[in-house]
Design a protein with these regions (language model features):
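Extracytoplasmic cell-surface/polysaccharide-interacting catalytic and binding patches
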Residues: 1-77, 81-194
Length: 194
C-alpha cells in the first residue's frame, strides 16, 4: 500500500475538472466550487448540489435510467471542509482511525468538496447495498457515457487508498469512457497522461 497522508500537496487549481483529490492531494479549507447547482429533487435525497456540468450530466443519467424503470438518486454530493471534518471525526470516534482512514477521507481530502462526486443509491434504499441492485449493474455499464467513473473500484485500494465503494462516482467528463475502458483509476489516468 502507498504512503497515504505522508507527502501531502495543496491543490493549486481546485476548479480543474480533472482535479485529483485524494490522501496525498488536499483542497484548502475555504474552497467552495463557484458553480454549484441544486440537483432536481426527482434525482436526489433531500437538497443536493453538484457543479453545473456534473449536475446536468447526472440529471440526464437519472432521467435515462428512469425510462428503464430504474431509480438512481444522489445520496451525498458536495460537502464542505467542515462537514467532512465532522464525518471523519465521527468515524474515528466510533470505529478508530485505521477504519476511518479506509472508508472516509480526512477533511480537505474528499472529492465531495469539489462538487464533482456523487454517492448514489437505487430503489432498494441505502447505498451500502448498492452493488446488489439492478441500478448498480446499469451504472457500471452506462455511467461513463454521462462522464462518470466508479471512483473506488474493488481491486484498486492500494492505488486510491479507499476501500471499494460501489456507490461513489466522480464526474470527469469525456475521458470517463477511456478511463473505464482501460480499467484505470483517476490516479492511473493522470499519471499516464500528464
Amino acid at each position: 500500500m502507498n504512503d497515504f497522508y505522508k507527502n501531502i500537496k495543496l491543490i493549486e487549481n481546485p476548479d480543474d475538472l480533472l482535479v485529483l483529490v485524494n490522501k496525498n492531494n488536499m483542497l484548502y479549507q475555504k474552497f467552495i466550487p463557484n458553480n454549484l447547482e441544486k440537483i432536481n429533487e426527482l434525482y436526489s435525497v433531500d437538497t443536493k448540489y453538484l457543479r453545473n456540468e456534473a449536475k446536468e450530466c447526472f440529471e440526464k443519467l437519472c432521467k435515462d435510467a428512469k425510462k428503464l424503470n430504474l431509480s438512481i438518486k444522489a445520496e451525498s454530493t458536495y460537502r464542505s471542509f467542515e462537514y467532512q471534518k465532522k464525518l471523519y471525526d465521527n468515524y474515528v470516534l466510533k470505529y478508530g482511525s485505521k477504519y476511518a482512514n479506509a472508508c472516509s477521507a480526512k477533511p480537505g481530502h474528499s472529492e465531495h468538496q469539489t462538487g464533482l462526486a456523487v454517492d448514489v443509491r437505487g430503489s432498494e434504499g441505502d447505498y451500502n447495498n448498492f452493488s446488489n441492485t439492478k441500478e448498480f449493474s446499469w451504472m457500471i455499464k452506462n455511467a461513463p457515457n454521462y462522464g462518470f467513473i466508479l471512483r473506488y473500484p474493488y481491486d484498486k485500494q492500494n492505488i486510491t487508498g479507499f476501500k471499494y465503494e460501489p456507490w461513489h462516482y466522480r464526474y470527469v467528463g469525456k475521458i470517463a469512457l477511456e478511463i473505464t475502458k482501460n480499467n484505470l483509476t483517476l490516479e492511473e489516468y493522470l499519471e499516464n497522461n500528464i
